[in-house]
Amino acid sequence: MDEESVSNGSLFSKFEGEETMGKVLLFSIVSIFTGILFLLLLHLYARLFWWRVEQHFNLNLIQSDDPGSTVIGRNPRRRRFVFAQSQEDPLHNAGLDSKILQSIHVVVFKCTDFKDGLECAVCLSDLVDGDKARVLPRCNHGFHVDCIDMWFQSHSTCPLCRNTVGSVEDTTHGGSEGLPQNQNFESGHSTNQHNPSQDQSFVHEFSTEPLSFPTNVLVWGDQNQVRSAGLVVTEESPSGNFAASYNDHQQESSSTRSQEVTAVVVDIPDNSSENLSERIDEEEPKSPMFTRLRLLKNVLSREKTNNNNV
């Protein structure tokens, strides 16, 4: 009897331990699934909340009558940029005049008007139907209204081509806008040789045109002054004979209205691959491996010649 009671007690305690372990395991599994469900519901709530915020911004933007509205949040996939004003010289960070900015027309983008589409270079996202965009008059580059407005708060040039932005009226009535920069410069220089009294007016006309360099030239400087090969061109040109200052490449040009900034121009030759191949051809005869191969080729050619003679 004693042995049976002991065996029954051990079995009862064993079953009781297994039952406790099962309850603990069940409670752990239920707790884990409850936590996962709570996180999933929290994620869905957050997505719904931000979706309502985006819809609110879109509604305010559509109802706004201001074409230059800078409300952020029209497209959830758009990158948001804030161009903060730095504490540098205001002459170097002068933004575009508000009158010129307002004179640039605002258009509504349509995919049918642009077969290849249109990408905003400021936020790096494509324009979709219904987006408001500004098309710059001189270079015909288009950008989002809010993006280009923030850009022009600290810049006065196009983000893509760096050409100076002017009003639509100036672009329409400008006589020399369609000429390339080098042709305009050469024609104006020859005119100044025949009529020196128009030197100062020609300098002012030439300085308003944006400088254009080839794609293989790197230029450093500010947007008001660029110096290359001794020739200095500024927006605020000093008084004097332009032809004389152009011919004298060694003389330093100075201006009382604009600071002189040194420009570093690095010319990258286009025929770099050809020069590299020529250099390799010149270095190959100097290598010992090439010399051995040439000697072996000569020996084989001699043996072949002897066999043919026999």
From Swiss-Prot:
* Compartments reported by the entry: Membrane
Q: Which PROSITE patterns match?
A: ZF_RING_2
Task: State the annotated membrane topology for this chain.
Answer: Single-pass membrane protein
GO MF terms here are: transferase activity; zinc ion binding
Coiled-coil annotation reads none
Q: Where are the transmembrane segments?
A: 24-44
Give the InterPro entries listed for this entry: ATL1/ATL16-like, Znf_RING, Znf_RING/FYVE/PHD
User: What pathway is this protein said to act in by its record?
Assistant: Protein modification; protein ubiquitination
Residue ranges annotated as compositionally biased, kind Polar residues, are: 179-201
Q: What class of enzyme is it?
A: transferase
Q: Which GO terms of the cellular component aspect does the record hold?
A: membrane
Stored SMART domains: RING
Q: Which GO terms describe its biological process?
A: protein ubiquitination
User: Which intervals hold the zinc fingers (RING-type)?
Assistant: 120-162
Q: Which SUPFAM superfamilies match?
A: RING/U-box
Keyword terms, alphabetized: Membrane, Metal-binding, Transferase, Transmembrane, Transmembrane helix, Ubl conjugation pathway, Zinc, Zinc-finger
**Sequence segments annotated as region (Disordered):** 170-201, 240-260
Q: Name one Pfam family in it.
A: zf-RING_2
Kindly state which reaction or reactions the protein catalyses.
Answer: S-ubiquitinyl-[E2 ubiquitin-conjugating enzyme]-L-cysteine + [acceptor protein]-L-lysine = [E2 ubiquitin-conjugating enzyme]-L-cysteine + N(6)-ubiquitinyl-[acceptor protein]-L-lysine
Q: What is its EC number?
A: 2.3.2.27
User: What does UniProt say about this protein's domains?
Assistant: The RING-type zinc finger domain mediates binding to an E2 ubiquitin-conjugating enzyme.
Task: Family membership, please give it.
Answer: Belongs to the RING-type zinc finger family. ATL subfamily.
Q: What is this protein called?
A: RING-H2 finger protein ATL60
State the species of origin: Arabidopsis thaliana (Mouse-ear cress)
Taxonomic path: Eukaryota, Viridiplantae, Streptophyta, Embryophyta, Tracheophyta
